[in-house]
Amino acid sequence: MDRLLDAAARLFADVGYEGATTNAIAEEAGVSIGSLYRYFPDRKALLGALAERHLRKMRGLHDRVFTPDVVYLPLPVLLDRLVDPFVELHTECPAFAHLLLGADTSADIADATCELDAEIVDRLAALFRQLAPGLDAARARLVASVSKSNVKALMSSVASQPDPAGRAALVAETKKMLLAYLQSVVDGGR
């Protein structure tokens, strides 16, 4: 089944959801079309399974990066810790940005993505309140939302940037922007 999902992810990234037929996915996976239909009744089911797999990976990454020690890290190191694993994940599978942000996203996938976004905002807001104890809850949520939105935009850009040097430049510039923003929040506490 993973072979089918991996093949679907490659084709969705290369030719888009509409261009990736079930026959092409089966061929890319090196299996018969009957084998594909044994696990997935249609392309939409493949898309849903891919999105679920990605959301599980994202939640797992959140759990690994949001450990109690992150509050003690210098901001540049903190940003590396929070951003780099997600860049790596989206670089490994550029179809993820298409799955979660694209027009092909189903209502269920969109709901799950919104839920994941809310979780990350909650975690970031709590972290920012620890970093800047004078920060009120509403401002912490706003800072968290702005930060999450910038990183989410970065993930979309990373997924569409085939050049490793170009990706690295996008990541570096986004981190510089976030560092300046977050440093002003931490220094000002509001």
Question: Language-model segments: what does each one mean?
Answer:
Residues 3, 7, 11-45, 49:
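Helix-turn-helix
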Residues 66, 77, 89-108, 125, ...:
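Amphipathic alpha-helical segments used for helix-helix packing
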Residues 47-54, 116:
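Alpha-helical DNA-contacting segments of helix-turn-helix folds
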Residues 41-45, 70, 91, 104:
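Residues in soluble alpha-helical coiled-coils and helical-bundle/repeat scaffolds
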Residues 4, 8-12, 58, 86, ...:
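Short hydrophobic clusters on alpha-helical segments that form packing/core surfaces
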